[in-house]
Design a protein with these regions (language model features):
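N-terminal subdomain of nucleotide-sugar transferases
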Residues: 1-60, 397, 401
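A conserved mid-protein helix/loop that constitutes part of the nucleotide-sugar donor-binding site
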Residues: 23, 216-239, 249, 256-262, ...
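Carbohydrate-associated surface elements
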Residues: 46, 169, 191
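Nucleotide-sugar donor phosphate/pyrophosphate-binding loop at the beta->alpha transition
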Residues: 124, 134-155
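Short alpha-helical donor nucleotide-sugar binding micro-motif in glycosyltransferases
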Residues: 279-280, 287-292
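Aromatic "clamp/platform" in nucleotide-sugar-dependent glycosyltransferases that forms part
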Residues: 300
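Short hydrophobic beta-strand element within catalytic cores of glycosyltransferases
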Residues: 317-321
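Conserved acidic donor-binding segment of nucleotide-sugar-dependent glycosyltransferases
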Residues: 332-333, 337-345, 354-359
Length: 401
């Protein structure tokens, strides 16, 4: 069988980066090409600067210019519907030119366009679920717009020919809440490439910008939303500072909870003990991993845990919540990182104090983690994805015969 021509749909793709999804889709697309597994076209949204079409690292990227996304969730739903209409129109035109064998959509944000295009092309539809609205809101999806998003995700996963989940936790979660048949969801974890994590800054100068030589830096990274659990880390910090004294925090990210988190920091007397950096690019982030004394991932809900993986690959000791996909990235046994009871700020404080006070433990975790992260290889991710494509296309051929 010749390698398939695949159309990947994603609402974000570099240079537009909202979160981890853009990075995931880029690396997957590039590795599908690099491993000779597929010819890959990515259909995504663009801006006033990005070219409408270009070839990047062997990937054909097609962009549809869209207005800046609104921050208000009610307006966002209408914006997503408009984006899907535009992606659908562009996809129809691309299909006439390229004749795709398979459509691969990422998350609910491109579900409608993916469904219509797969129907038009008479080809299989694969979807990757990176997170669910049910999980993000701890099961509260009874009111609009959460109910709408949950409904789209339910329809999308049942309509797809196959669903990809990034962890065994997510496979079970998706199968349960959307009543999917056994075997309909396949686990293909996210990957990492340590070469991508090379810092761009002078690390000594960068560290001096945020901390004195005798101060310890605690790094938190991600979207500033409730489910990421940053409020737990802030709650834990006053006691840590009282015990150890010379501790500062850095929070890298932006989101709807930013104002609340800053207000919480002020209320806890932390304004002079850390910095909210806002959104930062990958180059700066990779440098922050190198200057931090530890990275904390305190999520209440986490399908996978890419931040933890990146931190470990960068040689930064890591503490994660004992929840979701983080359990697979940082297995039990304190071999590659520490885990704390999810939602428990007091236990988090204990683990942070322990790690900052034990250099032998820190060094051992860093050494073990550097080997552990090698098992999350993007080439393996691409090959597993290509095998799934082959299985789905084979099933489609048998059905059509």
């Amino acid at each position: 069988m010749t390698k398939p021509r695949v159309l990947i749909l994603s609402w974000e793709y570099p240079p537009i980066v909202e979160g981890g999804l853009a990075r995931h889709v880029r690396k997957l697309a590039e590795q599908l090409v690099a491993t000779g597994s597929a010819e890959v076209h990515v259909l995504t949204r663009g801006d006033d600067v990005s070219p409408a079409e270009e070839e990047l690292d062997g990937v054909f990227v097609h962009r549809v210019r869209e207005p800046r996304r609104p921050t208000e969730l009610g307006e966002f739903i209408a914006w997503v519907e408009h984006m899907n209409a535009d992606l659908l129109a562009a996809g129809v035109e691309l299909g006439d030119r390229w004749h795709f064998d398979l459509v691969h959509g990422h998350d609910w944000l491109v579900a409608v366009a993916g469904d219509h295009l797969a129907n038009r092309f008479r080809c299989p539809l694969v979807v990757t679920v990176h997170a669910t609205e049910y999980g993000r809101h701890q099961g509260w999806v009874k009111e609009h717009p959460q109910s709408h998003i949950h409904g789209v995700e339910n329809w999308m996963t049942n309509r797809a020919d196959r669903v990809i989940a990034c962890s065994a936790y997510m496979r079970d979660h998706i199968s349960d809440i959307y009543s999917l048949d056994e075997g309909h969801v396949e686990v293909i974890p996210n990957g990492i490439d340590p070469i991508d994590l090379v810092p761009a800054d002078d690390l000594e100068t960068l560290r001096a910008e945020f901390a004195e030589p005798d101060e310890r830096l605690i790094l938190l990274v991600g979207r500033l939303v409730y489910e990421k659990g940053f409020h737990l880390a802030l709650e834990a910090l006053p006691g840590i500072i009282e015990t150890l004294g010379n501790v500062r925090f850095l929070i890298a990210g932006s989101g709807t909870a930013e104002a609340d988190l800053k207000a919480q920091a002020t209320e806890l007397g932390l304004d002079d003990h850390g910095t909210f950096l806002g959104w930062i690019g990958d180059d700066k982030l990779h440098s922050l991993y190198r200057i931090a004394d530890l990275t904390v991932v305190p999520s209440l809900y986490e399908p996978f845990g890419l931040v933890a993986l990146e931190a470990m690959a960068s040689g930064c000791p890591t503490i994660v919540a004992d929840t979701g996909g983080l359990r697979e990235v940082v297995p039990e046994g304190e071999r590659v990182g520490l885990r704390f009871n999810g939602g428990d700020a007091e236990h988090l404080a204990i683990m942070i104090e322990r790690l900052l006070s034990d250099d032998v433990l820190r060094d051992r975790l860093v050494a073990e983690a550097s080997e552990h992260v090698l098992s999350f290889d993007w080439a393996d991710v691409a090959r597993s994805t290509a095998q799934l494509y082959s299985d789905v296309l084979g099933s489609e051929a048998k059905t059509s015969a």
